[in-house]
């Protein structure tokens, strides 16, 4: 781990313009926006801010090379992704430094994201050559049936701020593998990592125009003209449920293929037969990874009443070991929230819970200074009516609710409009399968607190989204199925 990289030299290497048709260029309006370090409030970079004209120019560039790119061989595309995987690892400390500077997570966590994010490049470099079709006769014997997958076409990829590298690789890699061109819109709060990743893709040999990047302060100025353009054939979005719903409405006019990875309200269920020490260790990963700013973060700890006190005290002991501060400082294990609005929201959720009878076991205070810090917090005696139990927290707060039996645990866990991640700790294998059948979530971790993996299909149900990213399913989101019915020469006329 190298935290001694010269930050000024690194920031000077990161492109701050728009990537259109393989060229970095200024926004047509000349407008810019600033990127701040959430640990200090200092401006660390100023980027060109794309408008509607720039967005359309990026789509023009993507469309201009779509047919040629689709005709490249799977091996060519796989080799580019593999080279990108290698380059990301060669630049691991640079990527980690950028993430910590613009997003705030501790440097060691940023290093972990580099490893995780790069795996999507390696995984889809392998999947690119495994995009199999199917051949069989129809039951009547009159036709020979061939099904094959074709690139869906130009894509708009919109990524969030909380995992600046992994969310870009998780969308770009399958699009490249499938033979699609794309326009990438990174989050305005954390665009630097994506900008550097785009340059890395070019360095890996990606042809001009295949990947275009339009960072900007106005998301709607970029998304609206593209969604209205019939040439765009695919939208992939990771972000909040309200924004996702708005984008879905915009995608309806042109009947776009959509992938939506939206909000979550993950339950973390601890049954009476669970290994409590193991559950606490899993809870630290499920809750405090990324300081809780993750859609998969454990949002509600649903604990059997007979072990609630033991679990709470042991979890509190671990929370109190966390060191809050600037993620670039040695020994820091808990960084800042992304912005002042996020800090205010977390504080308001805790205040609402306390007003409704919850008890602060540890934490519950804002940090001092310029950064957006909040102490890791545990709340006990939390009711289901509190905002902290109903809303996505996106912060270092662990509300603990209790239950009496398995049916109540499932009722509490499913009492949400969301259905992304869930976690269960039990030593009973029969219960594991019963609970899996009863939970309404797309992802389930059993005796495991961190379950995301490039080889796994990631996605939710209900208001948590549509489609899957990663796994063998991930490349399918960027393809359309074509059926060929070929007359069987041995059949009758």
Feature names for model-found ranges:
Residues 44-50, 65-71, 157, 268-271, ...:
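Short, well-ordered beta-strand elements within core beta-sheets of diverse protein domains
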Residues 133-278, 403:
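Rossmann-like NAD(P) dinucleotide-binding subdomain of oxidoreductase/dehydrogenase enzymes
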Residues 242-383, 446, 491-493:
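ALDH superfamily catalytic-core signature
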Residues 42-45, 232, 269, 323, ...:
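Conserved C-terminal structural/oligomerization subdomain of aldehyde/semialdehyde dehydrogenase
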Residues 1-39:
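Hydrophobic face of amphipathic alpha-helices that form TPR/SEL1-like repeat modules
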Residues 42-132, 142:
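Glycine-rich loop-to-alpha-helix module at the N-terminal edge of alpha/beta enzyme cores
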Residues 41, 77, 99, 121, ...:
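Residue-level signal for inorganic ion chemistry
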Residues 181-183, 360, 443:
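A short hydrophobic/small-residue beta-strand
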